[in-house]
Amino acid sequence: MTYDNIVTGTFLKRPNRFIAYVEVKGDVKTCHVKNTGRCQELLVPGCTVVLEFHPKAKEMKRKTEYDLIAVYKGNLLINMDSQAPNQAALEWIREKEAKGLSLENVGIPTNIRREVTHGESRFDLAFELKDEVTGKTVPAFMEVKGVTLEKEGNVFFPDAPTIRGVKHLNGL
């Protein structure tokens, strides 16, 4: 997963969940915030943020030319794009060898699908794993979470109470 046209700026304020005002090269820009979470401990006035500039924003009928995709907290760069973890996980699992996923006698994931409903929950990814010894194929589900809460070098999920998170854990 890659971003194009990356620039940095200085965060000024976030009037609502969807936009932020950021100073870029001396000009104040309205930016789309790609994470609707609170992120209060990250988005503090004066912090350095990373933006993706969209030069064809008007042609694309976008309301903003910039997306706020990451923020520096000290020397840590923290992702703010809530879609990035799912895209990165999908790209990883589609590799011929999904390192770290393979269990003993379990083959490469197949029939990979996004946003799959199972029971009363919808999961980010679903796929099948084949037992190389028995030949049986078993379903597998993956719920991907990005983390934005950092304390003393450790990151946590969630950054606010979430009933949906409990539902996903119970569903898995």
Please name every model-derived segment.
Residues Y3-K13:
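Structural detector for short beta-strands of small beta-barrel domains
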Residues N16-Y21:
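Short aromatic-glycine-enriched beta-strand elements
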Residues V22-V28:
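OB-fold (S1/OB) nucleic-acid-binding surfaces
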Residues K29-C39:
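Short alpha-helix capping/helix-loop boundary micro-motifs
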Residues G37-V50:
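Short nucleic-acid-contacting surface segments enriched for D/E, G, S/T with interspersed K/R
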Residues E52-E97:
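Terminal, basic amphipathic appendages of nucleotide-handling enzymes
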Residues L76-Q83, S102-K145, R164-K167:
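Active-site metal-binding core of divalent-cation-utilizing nuclease and nuclease-like domains
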Residues G153-G171:
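Basic, amphipathic alpha-helical patches used to engage nucleic acids or provide basic targeting signals
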